[in-house]
Structure formats: structure tokens, C-alpha cells
Amino acid sequence: MSQNDLKIDVKALGKVAVLMGGTSAEREVSLMSGGGVLQALRSRGVDAHAFDPAHSDLSELKAHGYSRCFIALHGRHGEDGTVQGALELLGIPYTGPGVMASSIAMDKIMTKRIWRADGLPTPDWRLVSSSAETAQAFQELGAPMIVKPSREGSTIGLTKVTSLGQCEQAYRLAAQHDPEVLCEQFIDGDETTCPILGQGTEARALPVIRIEAPQGNYDYQNKYFTDVTQYHCPSGLPEAEEREIQRIVVQAYRTLGCRGWARADIMIRASDRKPFLLEINTSPGMTGHSLVPMSANASGISYPDLCLRILASASLDALQGRAGAAGGRESV
């Protein structure tokens, strides 16, 4: 897909701020994502500039004449609705979901509650506030069990617990990052991820990526800084399975009221091939190791054109009227 095929008037995009860095635990990855996006947009003739909220107040965006923002921030104070809320007040359109959808998606427990209420499959879970409650959750959910902060990304603070004796340490690690700790039933099977682009009934899933990590250890280091993890796109899954994953992620995206773009993580249980939603990322990575560019490329969208397409979708909640927030079940 070329820039001409996208039919985007680059000049009409105006002066663009690529928000990167920030103050979250994912700052380093955000700087890599933002650097890639910045270079890509400039290669397409966009008047794009780096902007780090850790060093500059967001109010400066208005003062310096920025007309829209590409959010390449990850984690807290980046994809949790706070920056989105500030940009709403400034009246500067931004990429990705709005305030409410961003804040909900950042909270894994709230996300799972909403998905479960809409009939979407997600692993059983417990919200815990102590190591004793973590041990109780382990007895109820069984082994293995995943323990992780409710509001962090990139597997930060995550532990795969295989014995009762690991519960205390796993809880302490997760609680360092968030007082709300999620214990989740582990799904043994294929790990996959699937990006979504668009809004409402126009939202569409890109090709599914199947992930093979060493000993199933798809952690922060393996995600961004090594080449030991293998990514399969095409996924190699049966066509019916891939289409079902795409259908589920689009429904999950729409149920939360997302717009612009996101990426959902899904496990396929080996015993019966049933897919389970784990979480949705509303400001996915755009590094050299990132998965949205890989999937987009498989569907014929280059990295620069992907960045341009996402930027062109920048909007404000005030312009949406909550359009596309209803769940609904859409085919892909």
C-alpha cells in the first residue's frame, strides 16, 4: 500500500508531535518506538518533531503550534488515559483510543470484567492484595498461575507460579509496580497477538502472529532486546482458527470503545484449541522487534505507511460522540 493509495494529504496533517519517552517503566522502549515513528513520518514528508513529556510540559504543545500528536508512549502516564485527557483539554487530536477506553484497557482486571460481561473468553482470575490471598488464588486456579500487576505492560512484574512456595515472592514483585495484583489461570498452548486498525464497524484485524519464545519465556528482555523469540506471520494456524481470533479481537476492541489502533494478545488452549483474550495494548510498540509493523507488512502496509495511516486517524473524544463504543459482533 503506497502513500498515494492511502490518499492522505500530508500538508493537512500540520505540525505533528511524536510523544515518546515519558516517565513509566517502559520509557526505554517508548524512546525506541518514538524514534522509529519520527523517522518514518519524516520520510513521508510530515512535519514531525520529538516531544518527551518527561522533559516538557504538555501545555507547550499548544504554545508551539502542534496540530496533532502521535502517541508513542507506553505504560502509565502514556496509555492510561492521562495524556489523552490532557490532549482533550488542549483540543489537540491524538492517535489511539480515547480517555475512557485507554484507562480501562490499562487496567487488566477491569478489562477482563467487561470482556467477561460481553461473553468474550478470558482466563479465570482473582484480584489479590496479599501473599496469603495469592496462595489462596493458587489453590483455586491451579498450577501454573500467572501473577502480574494489574496496570503495567511488557510483562513487567510478571511471574509464572508453579508451586505454592513461589506465591509470596511473586506477589511482592507484582505489588512493587501496582497495589492491585492479578492472579490469572495459565493457558497452555499457542501464544498469539493480533493488531486492529480503524473504528466501530470499520475496525479490521490484521494478520495474526504466532509467538514462540524459549521455554515459553516471552519476557521484557526477549520482547525487545534479543533475537531468541520466533515470530510466525503468517501464523501457520488453520484458517478457521485465525479468522476466529480476528473476530474475537475486533469484538474485544469495540467492546472497550477503542479507536485508531491497538493490539490484542490471545492464548489458544492446546487441549481444545479455544482462544482466550489476555489483554489489549492501546499504544503498542513500534520498535524493530514490535509486532504491529510485522503484521501490517504481511498485509502489504509498509512501516512508514502504517505510521502515516495511524497518524491520519488521530481524533478527540469530543469529536466522536462515543461513536463505536457499543460492543456488537462484527466479522472481519
Swiss-Prot record:
A cellular component term from Gene Ontology for this protein is:
cytosol
Do you know which InterPro entries this protein is assigned to?
ATP-grasp, ATP_grasp_subdomain_1, D-Ala_lig_Van_CS, D_ala_D_ala, Dala_Dala_lig_C, Dala_Dala_lig_N, PreATP-grasp_dom_sf
This protein's source sits in the domain of life called Bacteria
- Enzyme Commission number(s) from the entry: 6.3.2.4
- Give any single GO term for biological process: regulation of cell shape
Quick one: where is this thing mainly located? cytoplasm
Q: Which UniProt keywords apply?
A: ATP-binding, Cell shape, Cell wall biogenesis/degradation, Cytoplasm, Ligase, Magnesium, Manganese, Metal-binding, Nucleotide-binding, Peptidoglycan synthesis
Which positions in this protein are listed as binding ATP?
138-193
Could you say which residues bind Mg(2+) 2 here? E279, N281
The answer to whether UniProt assigns keyword Membrane to this entry is: no
Asked whether the UniProt record includes Transmembrane among its keywords, one would answer no
Which chemical reaction does it catalyze? Answer: 2 D-alanine + ATP = D-alanyl-D-alanine + ADP + phosphate + H(+)
**Limits of the ATP-grasp domain:** 112-312
Task: Detail which positions bind Mg(2+) 1.
Answer: D265, E279
Cofactors, names only = Mg(2+); Mn(2+)
From the Swiss-Prot or TrEMBL record, what is one GO molecular function term?
ATP binding
Record note on cofactor: Binds 2 magnesium or manganese ions per subunit.
Cite the PROSITE patterns for this sequence: ATP_GRASP (PS50975), DALA_DALA_LIGASE_1 (PS00843), DALA_DALA_LIGASE_2 (PS00844)
Q: Where in the cell is it found?
A: Cytoplasm
Q: In which pathway does it act?
A: Cell wall biogenesis; peptidoglycan biosynthesis
- Say which family it is in: Belongs to the D-alanine--D-alanine ligase family.
Recorded hits in NCBIfam families, A to Z, give: D_ala_D_alaTIGR, PRK01372.1
PANTHER family in UniProt: D-ALANINE--D-ALANINE LIGASE, D-ALANINE--D-ALANINE LIGASE B
**Briefly, what is this protein's role?**
Cell wall formation.
Write the protein's name: D-alanine--D-alanine ligase
- Upper taxonomic lineage: Bacteria, Pseudomonadati, Pseudomonadota, Betaproteobacteria, Burkholderiales
